[in-house]
Amino acid sequence: MGAGPGRMDSALICIMYLYIKALHIIFIVTWFSGMFYIVRLFIYNTEAEEKTGPAREILTAQFRIMSRRLWLGITWPSAILTLILGPWMWILLGGTPEWLIVKLIFVVLLYGYHFSLHFIYREQQKGIFRFSSQKLRIWNELATLFLFIIVFLASVKQVMSWVFGTVGIVSLALVLMLAIRIYKRMRTK
């Protein structure tokens, strides 16, 4: 069989899909890195706000600069590029498997989480601190749950039984909460 136009188009689509997938993964990694680190900066900024004198002024000013550079220079661009590349892959895939529908639901929720971080970012840039460092630590772990769920769905490529998935997520959430409590005790000693 010769290499007709149909085969060439199919091969080109496969190659294109792989390159887009690689870029999609890279921007997912940088997006998650940004979300994990921005909450750490929120925590440090919140704790710096509790200090007095020059230490407070110097630290909060520095954390605002670091937050702005991270959020606007890395995290938002990565979220936007992820949003562009994901649907592009979906179009090239040419179908919508069941696992992808479930994954997309969690991706929409992840963007909701991202917007909640943007709300906190804007408030902290204005000097408004509504959340304690402990609440921010707990909020930070939500990204971990999203990461586990989305990666497992994308890797296993099937909708796991709801019982297995629910038990796994609840177990992970409990382990994360336990780790936060242990860390809090270690910090206060």
Regions found by a protein language model. Give the residues of each.
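Low-complexity, intrinsically disordered Ser/Thr/Pro- and acidic-rich segments
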Residues: 3-8
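Polytopic transmembrane helical bundles with strong interfacial aromatic enrichment
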Residues: 9-189
